[in-house]
Amino acid sequence: MLAATCNKIGSPSPSPSSLSDSSSSFGKGFHPWKRSSSSSSASCNVVGSSLSSFGVSGASRNGGSSSAAAAAAAAAAAAAALVSDSFSCGGSPGSSAFSLTSSSAAAAAAAAAAAASSSPFANDYSVFQAPGVSGGSGGGGGGGGGGSSAHSQDGSHQPVFISKVHTSVDGLQGIYPRVGMAHPYESWFKPSHPGLGAAGEVGSAGASSWWDVGAGWIDVQNPNSAAALPGSLHPAAGGLQTSLHSPLGGYNSDYSGLSHSAFSSGASSHLLSPAGQHLMDGFKPVLPGSYPDSAPSPLAGAGGSMLSAGPSAPLGGSPRSSARRYSGRATCDCPNCQEAERLGPAGASLRRKGLHSCHIPGCGKVYGKTSHLKAHLRWHTGERPFVCNWLFCGKRFTRSDELQRHLRTHTGEKRFACPVCNKRFMRSDHLSKHVKTHSGGGGGGGSAGSGSGGKKGSDTDSEHSAAGSPPCHSPELLQPPEPGHRNGLE
């Protein structure tokens, strides 16, 4: 469309018919032209400027389509060209100036019409071409006034256009607050508090930086900084650093009173050390009451272990303390311990003896250690938790010492040696029998018999777990068994 318009503008001699058509439509109030130097120059100047401005403003203010605007621009350009060619205006310098400026005015009119059809600023700025046309025609004889008006229009319209563009950009920035078009160095982050106003700048007065709070985010060095801490860290106090980097922003307004007492190093000493003392004091009355006599060993010198401390009273303790100690449950389930527990303080004599009897009817075995009584009860029940891990053996025993004795049969170790003849034995009871042969008059036969019998007895004891046998590391009876008691068990 613009190319067609330019072709029409560049035609050297338009047809007179177009002049008649255009003159009939545009020149209703014009009088017949006369060939005068000054008047024709001035009138040509007026006609050229009025035609160009009329064509553009009419196309823009009527709000027509782009084709109508282009047609109007083409008609105005043709009329201006015909006027300049038909009325040559003599040889005056104004005629050459008009003939040059008329074509430039037509081109400017066409460009302005094309811009007005698509620009949102057409209604306000329909005279974009006026400064160029008037300035060019100012070179003529009567174009001085046009030149002055061009300067005034140039000084008025161009700042208005720039301000219009800036206001539209500001409106876009209001819609999209993070697009810094008008102000590229303005911060994107706006204060969220409604009463801040323009206080949301990064360098707001009175607000310290977030890294200047202190060594720790709770640590406050002095009361002045503690008093300034809520104001400098509250989100409404100012700016970018409070909305992004403040870890205490939402809490200092509520807990500002704690900055002097709980968060200060001097005042927080009463929270740590006395609290620790109070907590430790809470355990002090419990420990002596629960374990009043835990320091001395009650069976030291009696040949017992710690397990027998249950039924026996402490040497330095009162009957009341011992009753409180054993009030929870009986340490042993044997009949003697149950009777001592039932009697309470009166059963202190039974506890002092430390006797643990088997509750199986008809057995009557008594042991000085609860571990020995438990091993004996396993012998009654048939429980054998100790298993030999020797290859292809897998024998099971009721006591751990029996298992160790059995392992020596696999290894062939003889730990016990006779001090007289240096003979070695696997079991201590065999050695004791052998020593008796040296002290008595039994001779070697008895020793050999005891040795062979000891060997056989070792196997049978390991197999049957006889509780009355007196080997080393095995539970010993308080009363030695009768000579035929072992054989009866076997």
Swiss-Prot record:
Transcription factor which plays a key role in limb development. Positively regulates FGF8 expression in the apical ectodermal ridge (AER) and contributes to limb outgrowth in embryos. This is Transcription factor Sp8. The lineage of its organism: Eukaryota, Metazoa, Chordata, Craniata, Vertebrata. InterPro entries: Znf_C2H2_sf, Znf_C2H2_type. The 9aaTAD motif is a transactivation domain present in a large number of yeast and animal transcription factors. Residues 16-25, 36-47, 297-314 have a biased composition (Low complexity). One of its GO terms (biological process) is regulation of transcription by RNA polymerase II. Its main location: nucleus. GO terms for cellular component: chromatin; nucleus. It is found in: Nucleus. The keyword DNA-binding applies. A motif (9aaTAD) lies at residues 208-216. It holds the Pfam family zf-C2H2. The keyword Zinc applies. Keywords: DNA-binding, Metal-binding, Nucleus, Repeat, Transcription, Transcription regulation, Zinc, Zinc-finger. A zinc finger (C2H2-type) spans 314-338, 344-368, 374-396. Belongs to the Sp1 C2H2-type zinc-finger protein family. Residues 136-148, 439-455 have a biased composition (Gly residues). The gene is SP8. Gene3D superfamilies: Classic Zinc Finger (3.30.160.60). GO terms for molecular function: DNA-binding transcription factor activity, RNA polymerase II-specific; RNA polymerase II cis-regulatory region sequence-specific DNA binding; sequence-specific double-stranded DNA binding; zinc ion binding. Residues 1-47, 136-156, 294-324, 431-490 are annotated as: Disordered.
